[in-house]
Amino acid sequence: MPVIGTFCVSVDKDVCVNAQSPGKCATCVEVCPYGVYEIDAQGQVHVNNYNTCVGCRICAEFCPANAIRINPAESEYLSRYPWTFGQIEEIHHKSLTGGYLLRGFGTAGPLPHFDGIVVVPSQLASESPRDKYREECQMEVVIGEDTAEEPITLRYPILFPAMSYGALSREAKLALAIGAAKTGIATNTGEGGVVPEEPYYANGYADPERKEQKWAPGGYLVIQWSTGRWGVSADYVNAGDAVEIKIGQGAKPGMGGHLLGAKVTEEIAAVRGIPVGSDALSPCRYYDVLSFEDMKKMVAFLRDVTDYKKPILMKLGPSRPYDDVRMAAEAGVDAISIDGICGGTGASPDVVTQGVGIPTIACIPPAVRALKDLGLHRKVKLIALGGIRNGLDAFKALAM
């Protein structure tokens, strides 16, 4: 696929009508107003001049075999901004369906991220650096040591965030549980209920009787308590090692969860307690929490249901980090997760994922400051989520 001008023109010869039967179709030649295509003496169509293509996609729209692809040879932000193909296609979709675009994953596009931050190394004027080959580094993190009878001790300062059963398959959920067990960290049910094997898999056992540990050193399962209350019961809340109250998430702050009906199989419907094939929509807030005092009562209620044995966490979306973290800490939780705009999701309106929230790196400093102002930064743990891709990103988040 030659690239000469601003746009790349490619024709799939396997489906092109003209390529299969020369002379039978020349729609692209007829509709292109810029002379990009030509037809030779044998009736075969060729791309004649890449330089004249302006990216209008008229040829692609009229091609009866859908064989033509027009893609920018450079970023659309340089060639067509602000009227990118994505913007135009979204307008078409809304006009045809009356609905918004719904998609998974997270925010796409250039946002402030960890790549824009560098680490200042230790040298003479600061604490001496450590020799990574010869000196040990304490990495354990304990959550709930002052409030829960059974605090959790993460072997490393990382964990698997909440991803619901339904957004992920059963196999994926159990793989995360085994991964948590092998590394001594925690995984999270998400708001879709618990897979039956998930609690003992996360603890490192292959059987519910927990006779012999298979995956050492064993990890933890965090049970998520969300606005939808999918599959919630006293047994559910006590099935794991900690409970997380979900207030929001990075990819769709201000909105509740959404599991598409196409993903609601018989097994998932049974766990969530909903009909097969129906969309699972969580409210955007807790209807039984109308004030800060109600939030404190919810934390106290969950401590009571778990017999004061398990740590209580709270997950926040990217809104007002300082004030939100301060309120969460004052509500009495043991750890606070704050999920930046780069966080992922199984399904969300594209307009919300792209345009609502603040970057993860902008959430961390005010969240830390809120805990310090309350004198709780050594007691309440802060968990940063959203777009952390590797060890360097995690290190930068810890350093902030």
Predicted regions: what is each one?
Residues P2-V15, Y34-V36, Q42-V45:
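N-terminal cysteine/histidine-rich coordination modules
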Residues E61, P283-M400:
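Glycine-rich phosphate/ribose-binding loops and adjacent secondary-structure elements
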Residues Q44-V47, G192, P196-Y201, K252-G256, ...:
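Glycine-rich, proline-tolerant flexible connector loops at the mouths of alpha/beta enzymes
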Residues G231, A239, E244, Q249-R285, ...:
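Hydrophobic, small-residue-rich alpha-helical packing segments that form membrane-like cores
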Residues K13, A19-C28, C56-C59, L376-H377:
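Cysteine-cluster motifs in flexible loop/terminal segments that predominantly coordinate metals
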Residues M1-V3, A65-I158, A162-G254, L260-G261:
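Conserved, well-structured core domains of diverse proteins
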